[in-house]
UniProtKB/Swiss-Prot annotation:
Residues 1-26 are annotated as: Disordered. GO terms for molecular function: structural constituent of ribosome. Residues 1-20 have a biased composition (Basic residues). It comes from Desulfatibacillum aliphaticivorans. It holds the Pfam family Ribosomal_L32p. Belongs to the bacterial ribosomal protein bL32 family. GO terms for cellular component: large ribosomal subunit. InterPro entries: Ribosomal_bL32, Ribosomal_bL32_bact, Ribosomal_zn-bd. This is Large ribosomal subunit protein bL32. It comes from the Bacteria. One of its GO terms (biological process) is translation. HAMAP family: Ribosomal_bL32. Signal peptide: none annotated.
Length: 58
């Protein structure tokens, strides 16, 4: 099994890990009710998408 010949510094390790971060989800407000929702998804509170009611909610 391969082993490293020299120890990698913490800065080299951290530079390699810079692309492994998580991104926060892009949240927009629903134009009908104003509640937060994910873009290109049905609003969970009012059930509308692109101005049409797709799911009946109470």
């Amino acid at each position: 099994m391969a082993l490293p010949k020299h120890k990698k510094s913490k800065s080299k390790r951290d530079k390699r890990r810079t692309h492994q971060k998580l991104t926060a989800p892009n949240v927009v407000s629903c134009p009908q009710c104003g509640d937060p929702k994910l873009p290109h998804h049905i609003c969970p509170s009012c059930g509308t998408y692109k101005g049409r009611t797709l799911i009946e909610t109470d």
